């Protein structure tokens, strides 16, 4: 789809390499994109190219016409991921991580339960669906609190609040913009270091590709911050925790394909 702040050229790069890899395996490839500025819409990249908006109505017409073996959503960013639920509901095969796993990763409450089950540390959190619930939760979480809606990437709607007035205003604003959304409130780890791991998994074995350390403190969206590869300031103990957590999370989600996990590190504990 179109370039937006926090979502752009990296997904074009992923799509091109995904198409090339599928072609090498002998598959006919079909690319759907409405952005003429991208490499993935060059005439010689995919076998077939549809210049269509990445909306369900258009996608479904193409799928009915082409009858593909499956659809890959994990290379197109949030725009493509949002289509997974409808693809799953209409019985279209998603190649790679299933819709069930994608939904588990994007639903903040369910994902936090998964962390609890796998003994992975996480900041104290709660899930709220109304402003009253959020205010009640703030009593046990202690400020500052990080507020995030579910089912968004790119840091959309994410804010650190420091008192009840801020919290109420932000929650009301979010629920007006995204009705019926579950909001995750967690205690903001002040002064924590942020790191992230990229890995690839086939559902059985996890291969960690790289671990990056962010220069800016935790809470600044990764699209707005700089990261170094390899990390410049993480000890062996912290690195081992990151590797262990990445392995556990990738396998618990039944990941098939790529996964990116972001961590906060405070007092040598990886959250």
Language model: regions and residue ranges:
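N-terminal beta-alpha lobe that positions the nucleotide/phosphoryl donor
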Residues: 2-261, 265-271
């Amino acid at each position: 789809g179109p370039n937006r702040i926090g979502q752009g050229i990296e997904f074009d790069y992923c799509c091109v390499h995904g198409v090339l890899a599928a072609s090498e395996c002998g598959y006919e490839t079909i690319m759907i994109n409405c952005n003429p500025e991208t490499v993935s819409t060059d005439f010689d990249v995919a076998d077939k190219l549809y210049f269509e908006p990445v909306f369900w109505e258009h996608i479904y017409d193409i799928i009915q016409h082409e009858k593909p073996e499956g659809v890959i959503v994990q290379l197109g960013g949030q725009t493509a991921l949002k289509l997974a639920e409808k693809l799953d509901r209409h019985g279209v095969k998603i190649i790679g991580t299933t819709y069930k796993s994608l939904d588990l990763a994007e639903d903040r409450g369910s994902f936090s339960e998964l962390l609890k089950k796998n003994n992975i540390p996480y900041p104290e959190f709660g899930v709220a669906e109304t402003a009253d619930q959020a205010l009640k939760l703030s009593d046990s979480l202690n400020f500052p609190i990080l507020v995030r809606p579910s089912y968004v990437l790119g840091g959309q709607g994410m804010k650190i609040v420091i008192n009840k007035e801020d919290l109420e205003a932000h929650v009301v604003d979010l629920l007006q913009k995204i009705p019926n959304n579950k909001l995750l409130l967690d205690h903001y780890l002040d002064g924590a270091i942020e790191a992230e791991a990229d890995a690839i998994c086939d559902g059985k074995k996890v291969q960690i590709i790289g671990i990056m350390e962010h220069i800016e403190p935790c809470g600044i969206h990764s699209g707005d911050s700089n990261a170094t590869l390899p990390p410049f300031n993480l000890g062996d103990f912290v690195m081992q925790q990151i590797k262990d957590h990445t392995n556990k999370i990738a396998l618990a989600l039944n990941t098939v394909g790529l996964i990116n996990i972001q961590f906060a590190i405070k007092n040598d504990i990886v959250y």
